[in-house]
């Protein structure tokens, strides 16, 4: 058990509120709490009492003692529920520090829960995901991960994989058993089952990352093409100033919305053109930089001279910026102002026709965006995931494919080696084998007090 010292932090958000919670965890948590309250605390009882700094009353509230290992961290934990005034809470923190506690680092309570086997690494990350979820579906999916749905799937997969590894390695170590790799259907069927499960988890992880991290959309195009109007139409409110004057948007304008429960981070940028205006030029530089960070680019145009516009044609539309736009970026061409046309072309491939001002075609555009990122809305089976999970699963998938190749070639030792590599990648998801650097990076992204 992790029992180095005792930590303290405010567990509720900053600012004023009806209640503020202070969390203390560690070997001296009970002793410190009893010094602060001058009470003997019973495990799992709510005790209403004063909180003192020496003999001076700071506040009164409810104190709950959770005796190890039946606590969030697996250590002795005390929660002090006081009035939610930052000055009062900080006075209680100072009193706890005077009694021997130290300030917790970001995510240290959850890190201790992980080190004390109360949570695996995927569940620990889900704690942050559920706190930061920006949609109802994202919150529900994070709850599934926190309950262990993702971890159970990985652990079930590991169980099958380890059994297969043992079987393969036994056949190598004990050749007298005369197992023929090319003919043994047990190995073939087990490997094929593992392959299919990893593929399914791979697809689920992709959905989970979309829900956990959202999609970043960048609106780009020439001035006055209707980018700001499109931002307002997608957001359903007036987020950006819209005028008939080209170059109105001179800086980055951000809006966070949901499309079918999927978080979307939409960024409106300055119109791309050569400008002598220092402020507008800086906005254009920022726009180019943001394009490189996008999951998708919505290239807004009101030019209908070529409805079959392709990426190479952007060189003609904005030649001065063509070389600065990544050639592998996912671009949807949004043809705006169709209300001015007598005949509206049909949507096709990456070309969507809309009128942002009149809200025509916006739903079709939203549907197109979700399809482009591969979101399937199967929220009953989706759990949140991180990019590192996707990387691990993708690597595991590549090596399980190599394992199948080695099986077909009859290379038992290389097959066993590939299975071991797959196991290591899967173990990294739940934290079975994780470096201190990785753990530090993960938990440092948490808020203080969690």
Swiss-Prot record:
It comes from the Bacteria. Its EC number is 3.6.-.-. It is found in: Cytoplasm. Keywords: Cytoplasm, GTP-binding, Hydrolase, Magnesium, Metal-binding, Nucleotide-binding, Potassium, tRNA processing. GTP binds at residues 224-229, 243-249, 268-271. One of its GO terms (molecular function) is GTPase activity. GO terms for cellular component: cytosol. PROSITE patterns: G_TRME. Residues 214-374 form the TrmE-type G domain. Mg(2+) binds at residues 228, 249. (6S)-5-formyl-5,6,7,8-tetrahydrofolate binds at residues 23, 79, 118, 450. GO terms for biological process: tRNA methylation; tRNA wobble uridine modification. InterPro entries: G_TrmE, GTP-bd, GTP-bd_TrmE_N, GTPase_MnmE, MnmE_dom2, MnmE_helical, P-loop_NTPase, Small_GTP-bd. SUPFAM superfamilies: P-loop containing nucleoside triphosphate hydrolases, TrmE connector domain. Homodimer. Heterotetramer of two MnmE and two MnmG subunits. Exhibits a very high intrinsic GTPase hydrolysis rate. Involved in the addition of a carboxymethylaminomethyl (cmnm) group at the wobble position (U34) of certain tRNAs, forming tRNA-cmnm(5)s(2)U34. This is tRNA modification GTPase MnmE. It comes from Francisella tularensis subsp. tularensis (strain SCHU S4 / Schu 4). The lineage of its organism: Bacteria, Pseudomonadati, Pseudomonadota, Gammaproteobacteria, Thiotrichales.
